């Protein structure tokens, strides 16, 4: 499973002109299930995402997770957006292959599982809509962007 995470000062996702998810300071995570991924992989990726220390502490070092973005216990937002293109095979030719991505029904099931698990563990979780044509707006803080990937 893959998550491309970006530290943001704000982010939102819109579908068909309506906002489906919006956060202030926190993390925007573009999330992709790959063929063979399991709930265990989703749990492992979520634990990494929630614990990843990308927010600055008082000394200015990236040392704080999304659950404590200011060093005083304030949780940041988490905006989860499904994006199967993260699994693209770009090794040959000029057109990406999406064979490595989980089939749509399995991808939807794992994304829903990931979102439910995130909501059980973090107070501020917003989402896009799986499989929809979405418009994502963000202000990347830093910029700070990381590729997280776990194998089943």
UniProtKB/Swiss-Prot annotation:
- Compartments reported by the entry: Cytoplasm
Pfam families assigned to the protein according to its UniProt record, in alphabetical order = Tyr_Deacylase (PF02580)
Motif Gly-cisPro motif, important for rejection of L-amino acids covers 142-143
Q: What class of enzyme is it?
A: hydrolase
Assembly and oligomerization: Homodimer.
Task: Give the family per the record.
Answer: Belongs to the DTD family.
What the entry lists under NCBIfam families is as follows: D-aminoacyl-tRNA deacylase
Q: Which PANTHER family does the protein's record reference?
A: D-AMINOACYL-TRNA DEACYLASE 1 (PTHR10472:SF5), D-TYROSYL-TRNA TYR DEACYLASE (PTHR10472)
Q: What is this protein called?
A: D-aminoacyl-tRNA deacylase
Which organism is the protein's source?
Burkholderia cenocepacia (strain HI2424)
Report which gene this protein is encoded by: dtd
């Amino acid at each position: 499973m893959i998550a491309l995470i970006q530290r943001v000062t704000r982010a939102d996702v819109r579908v068909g002109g309506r906002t489906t998810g919006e956060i202030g300071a926190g993390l925007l995570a573009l999330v992709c299930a790959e063929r063979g991924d399991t709930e265990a992989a989703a749990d492992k990726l979520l634990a990494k995402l929630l614990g990843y220390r990308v927010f600055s502490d008082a000394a200015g070092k990236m040392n704080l997770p999304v659950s404590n973005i200011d060093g005083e216990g304030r949780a940041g937002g988490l905006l989860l957006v499904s994006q199967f293109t993260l699994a693209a095979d770009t090794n040959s030719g000029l057109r990406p292959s999406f064979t490595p991505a989980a089939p749509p029904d399995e991808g939807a099931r794992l994304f829903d599982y990931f979102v439910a698990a995130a909501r059980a563990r973090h107070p501020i979780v917003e989402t896009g809509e799986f499989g929809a044509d979405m418009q994502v707006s963000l202000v990347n803080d830093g910029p700070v962007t990381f590729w997280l990937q776990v194998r089943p």
